[in-house]
């Protein structure tokens, strides 16, 4: 329900506002500066998340791409969500998208500057809200509003502080350990805080006893995987004939779940996320799937934001950045520039593979005007492994992408009426 997301992010905003009310903004006390930075960082993040859901993107589309501009394109003056800060009194109407982004940038840039002044650009713990976490969200926000130089600036902060995953062991670990070198922000999951069957790994881990392991299979879109090169390590995230196919004693081809002798439940079944970690699976240990750490931000995103922003600017450096990144996934990768639109499409495709199952495609589709197209007419019935109800096409300016405002908000906020509903 859309009410869940609304409450989640406004709870973050309320907590941040309560902290900010207690701190004198002119205070130079390091403890006060730290807590002010943390509160502003979380508030900016929460408004950014709300902006993705309750209105169309600031701009739908960008010039020089295959997808172009949406029909309306500029939603900056459209109503978004109520803007509430520590100084706000009384009910508030829906602020415009532009007003929300002004607040996002103000909160996050102030937080970043405070963290930098406190030598907290990167702290020792991946669970900390710090300067790099804020920088990643600033990079995301600036991509939405086409501030390419600012996006590069803040992406570079993360790049300067974090490597990307390099080895096959790291890339295939299972994304369940916040000690991985690319983890910018995450949560340490233990027996005390695991939600077990309500957890991320219950939903995504093929090897566990959660939903994804006992019948609610997670599979990737066939055309997405079929485009991955044989030499790309990431192909091994998906079980298909090219990655885990074998010939049985009868001469029949079967696809196995990676690192096991068990056949897949469905072709293209995903094994990217492994709660207990791949080393345990290879050793025959399948327990502990519910203890996988949550990884919220990975450094690879900053590298890909930078290369995309460079491409939008028409910089040849974008190809250099893309090739450098991709050689860690596919050693024989070598992209040759033809035109800007194709380059941006290639970057977005590789980003979609890299972050499969991590939620970034939704954000990128919104800001780049990429339709969600799962129809047989486009892909061919033989290539479309979506179930029938999932075979649809929507453009980014279509209503299904707009979350509804909770009825409780409309009923209890004196500045809203039913006519304010999306």
Regions found by a protein language model. Give the residues of each.
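Alpha-helical solenoid scaffolds that mediate protein-protein interactions
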Residues: 19, 23, 50-51, 111, ...
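Conserved, well-structured interaction surfaces
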Residues: 1-56, 95, 113-115, 288-294, ...
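TPR-repeat structural position
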Residues: 101, 148, 315-316
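Short, surface-exposed recognition loops and adjoining beta-strand edges that mediate ligand/DNA contacts
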Residues: 55-77, 117-200, 336-341
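Hydrophobic-face positions in mid-chain alpha helices that act as interaction patches
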Residues: 128, 152-295, 299, 354, ...
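Inward-facing hydrophobic residues that define packing positions of alpha-helical scaffold repeats
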Residues: 13-16, 101, 108, 155, ...
